[in-house]
Every structure is written in structure tokens, then in C-alpha cells.
Amino acid sequence: MKNTVFTGAATAVVTPLNKNGVDYEAFERLIEWQISEGIDAIVVAGTTGEGSTLTDEEHRQVLKFAVDKIAGRVPVIAGTGSNDTSYAIDLTKYACSIGADAMLVVTPYYNKATQNGLIKTFTAIADASTKPVILYNVPSRTGCNILPKTCAVLAEHPNIVAIKEASGNISQIAETAALVKGKMDIYSGNDDQIVPILSLGGKGVISVLSNVFPRETSEMCKAFFRGETEKSRDMQLDMLDLINALFCEVNPIPVKAAMAAMGYGENFLRLPLTPMEPEHEANLLAIMRKYGLNV
């Protein structure tokens, strides 16, 4: 039986940036606050962390900074995916060497690999890793979908332990869950589908929402695991307005604005990402205030 990397909520943390580079002071404060709020794991340099627009040097520095500061208090999951498989392998080896607890590896984007190509790619990365590998399926961003039968093949690899499912296709996710049961954990990759995926046997969520509400997002999962399914469902439904506001523009544009309003760095993004439209930002902040946040 493979070990589960985490149960509950893992925050896909933003990477605070400014015109000079990474704002490590704000990043450290964000990490400490997340841990103090009871988050179950932290994902670094993923989609929300703008891993695709960090330089290679920045990417490695951000990973090492997080591993060193977190110091084993919660699992650190390193975003090491790329559409260049050799680079993904190199970054995975580096993340293993500095003590990251697991890797989050997105499907190769733009290249549009076949299912056989995905099997060979993820196998090569997992073979090179000394730590657990979590697959990341987000076809709306990558143009590439990991089909259930492909997950079933990959679930046989001893280092491939889970999948972050952000396809949004509950029927597909249910089919995957049926095929990989006991061999691969499933995490929701969409904040509006946390409870539906938990009901299919999911182990939690890799979340954007938990940047803003780490304790509540974790509790949504834990309530479900305790058998308090109505509480968990109600928390999911109660959060929908905020979730929708956090995704009214492409992630991480809205959450970057939200975290800046909460004092965790500047609302600074790198092209091709641009700051949130003023009317959308005003609506987001109004909704955050409705949820009791002082922004």
C-alpha cells in the first residue's frame, strides 16, 4: 500500500513578487500564517505560484526557501512539471535533493502528448524521483487530458501515488477513482468540487481558496472524514460566492489581488498575466468583506 502524502487541504500558495523579484519576506509570512491556521500541506511553485514565469534560478530558490522555512512541519509539495520532460526530471531531482516531500507534475502543455506519451513521460519522471509523485490533470490549461485508463496504468508505478484532478469532469473522475482504488489517491484540483470528489473517495484538495481561508478549507475536508457530511456540504456551498470571485479571471490573477489586500506582498504579476480588472477586483474585495475579512 502506498503512503498518502496528505489528507485535507494543501494550499497552492501564491509566490509574492515585485519588480525586483521574489518578495521572500512576504512569502515567509504567508507560509507561517498558513501553518498557524492549520493547513495540511503546502504546494510551492505550481500554477497559483506562477511557476511557469519564474526563472530556473528563482524556481529552485523558492522551493529551497519553502522547504527550509517549513522544516518538516507540514509536507512540502514541489511543482516540478514542464512541457520539457528533461527539465521536469532535472527539477524533480533537485526538489528531491533539498528535501521536498512530494512532486506535483502537470501534464506537458502545448505539446499535446498522446496517452502513450503521457505514460512514458510520467514514468520517466517517476523513475527519476526518490519521492512520491502526484500527477496533475488540468486539460483546460494544458490541452492534454489524462484519461482514466492511463491513470490505471500509471497507478502501478510505485512512486506515482496520487492525482490532482482539475478536469472538472465528475464522470471521468469517478471512472478514474473506480480504476485506481487503493493504488492512487485523488485530490480535487477545483475548489467548487471539494465535497463531490471527497464523496468519490478523494483524500482532499489542492486549493486556491485556502490561500484566503486555510483553516476553513481544511475543516471542510476533515468534517467530511469525521462523517459530518452535511457540515462539509454546507461549508462547500457557503464558500461558492468567494470561490467564484477567485476564478472570475484566470488563476492566479484574482487570488494574487486577494492576498495583496490581506497584506501578503504586492499585487504584482508577470506577463502574460496582468492585474485584475478594477471592477472585478472591487467585487472580489466586497465579497471578501462579506466573509468577514478586513480588506
Q: Positions of the model-derived regions?
A:
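Gly/Ser/Thr-rich beta-alpha loop segments that engage phosphate groups in nucleotides
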Residues: 10, 48-51, 81-83, 145, ...
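Catalytic alpha/beta core domains of metabolic enzymes, predominantly
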Residues: 127-128, 141-247
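A general structural signal for well-ordered alpha-helical segments in protein cores
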Residues: 6, 27, 59, 63, ...
